[in-house]
Regions:
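N-terminal segment immediately downstream of the Sec signal-peptide cleavage site
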Residues: 2-88, 221-254
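Low-complexity, compositionally biased segments
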Residues: 4, 12, 26, 89, ...
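Intrinsically disordered, low-complexity regions enriched in small/polar residues
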Residues: 14, 32-34, 38-40, 58, ...
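Predominantly extracellular/secreted and cell-surface proteins with exposed
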Residues: 50-183
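A eukaryote-biased signal for long
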Residues: 138-254
């Protein structure tokens, strides 16, 4: 089965990414993105519960339209939203008590925004305003494949640096992983590949945590699924987005 995957063909890899992340027919998709964010402080001989601890949960979604351009690249137009939730209860946060600084701080109401990007045979093309350096850029797309019977595990990793005005650069090592059916992957007529998706990221502290020079970093774990109807998203998330970003989910994509 591995031989039929064209695993070393950048064009097959590119189309696979487009079909996993969205629907190449041009149909709108909604990716539901719930997850957990941990604080990790290594090298200080801390007790297990202090070395690593769950800080908060996140919940969000990405509305996306994908299409194949004449040159074979995939254009993705999207808008994303992410909100923060209590580590234990999952209730949406307005304030957060930082266990490292012992300060109570205001939580951003919502994160995210619009984006237009392109997947190409020489890596993704992203808006220059992102200030992003990444090992994914300027290189053919590559995925790692494992096949066992009808199951396929697909993964990739990237190291990145995001530079934002008036703040220090933020470094990140991220790992993407999809699990899908081999028959869906090999179906050349299918414009979308159903899968479960996991994003794991080891990254610097978020600026709103006000960590200053406190040692340590964040470990993100987000598990996602792509759907075709807005109504398939959790009703509580839709209600929260209407509170913090009224009407945005119904706006046309950029």
């Amino acid at each position: 089965n591995e031989r039929t995957l064209s695993a070393n063909d950048p064009a097959f890899t590119l189309r696979t990414l487009g079909r996993l992340q969205g629907d190449l027919s041009g149909r709108i998709t909604y990716t539901y993105n719930p997850g957990f964010v941990f604080g990790v402080v290594p090298g200080r001989a801390l007790a297990p519960g202090e070395f690593g601890q769950l800080l908060y949960q996140v919940e969000g979604c990405t509305k996306r339209v994908s299409r194949v351009l004449d040159d074979g690249s995939v254009e993705e137009r999207s808008r994303s939203w992410m909100v923060y939730c209590d580590a234990d209860t999952g209730e949406y946060l307005q304030e957060f008590h930082n266990p490292y600084t012992d300060e109570t701080i205001v939580v951003p109401a919502v994160r995210g925004g619009p984006s237009v990007s392109r997947l190409t045979l020489n890596g993704p093309i992203l808006p220059a305003s992102l200030g992003l350096e990444s090992t994914l850029l300027d290189t053919p797309p590559r995925l790692h494949w494992r096949v066992l019977g009808e199951r396929v595990w697909i993964s990739r990793y990237a190291a990145s640096r995001i530079s934002v005005a008036n703040s220090k650069p933020r470094n990140e090592l991220s790992m993407d992983a999809w699990v899908c059916h081999l028959s869906d992957l090999l179906d050349e007529q299918a414009t979308h590949i159903p899968s479960t998706y996991t994003w794991t990221s080891h990254a610097d502290w978020q600026s709103w945590l006000q960590m200053q020079d406190h040692p340590g970093s964040l470990l993100w774990r987000v598990e996602s699924v792509v759907m075709h109807e807005k109504e398939q998203l959790p009703s509580r998330l839709l209600a929260q987005l209407e509170r913090v970003a009224p009407g945005q989910i119904n706006l046309p994509l950029p």
